Amino acid sequence: MGFGGISIWQLLIILLIVVMLFGTKRLKSLGSDLGDAIKGFRKSMDNGEAEKPAVEEPKGQTIDAQARKVEEPAKKD
């Protein structure tokens, strides 16, 4: 038994069919594009951490005010 109940021979047949359908040139370019995308993602993640500015916490403010009761409108029956 191989991966998930699939034998090595079945995996090789699937790989052969994929190569025959897409061709080696297209698979090579697809792998290259995928690798470039992963490198770009990692680079942007590293740059995001390095360039992240320090976040300043807003300072609390105290407001001096007096509470007063607001008149409520008369209820209509």
Swiss-Prot record:
Spans annotated as Disordered: 46-77
Subcellular location: Cell inner membrane
Keyword annotations from UniProtKB, A to Z: Cell inner membrane, Cell membrane, Membrane, Protein transport, Translocation, Transmembrane, Transmembrane helix, Transport
Membrane topology (UniProt): Single-pass membrane protein
Domain of life: Bacteria
Pfam families per the UniProt record, alphabetical: TatA_B_E
Paired cysteines (S-S): none
GO BP annotations, alphabetical order: protein transport by the Tat complex
GO MF: protein transmembrane transporter activity
Keyword Cytoplasm included in the entry's annotation: no
GO CC annotations, alphabetized: TAT protein transport complex
Biased composition (Basic and acidic residues): 46-59, 66-77
Membrane-spanning parts: 2-22
Summary of the function given for this chain in its UniProt record: Part of the twin-arginine translocation (Tat) system that transports large folded proteins containing a characteristic twin-arginine motif in their signal peptide across membranes. TatA could form the protein-conducting channel of the Tat system.
Similarity-based family: Belongs to the TatA/E family.
Quaternary structure and partners: The Tat system comprises two distinct complexes: a TatABC complex, containing multiple copies of TatA, TatB and TatC subunits, and a separate TatA complex, containing only TatA subunits. Substrates initially bind to the TatABC complex, which probably triggers association of the separate TatA complex to form the active translocon.
Protein name: Sec-independent protein translocase protein TatA
The species this protein was found in: Ectopseudomonas mendocina (strain ymp)
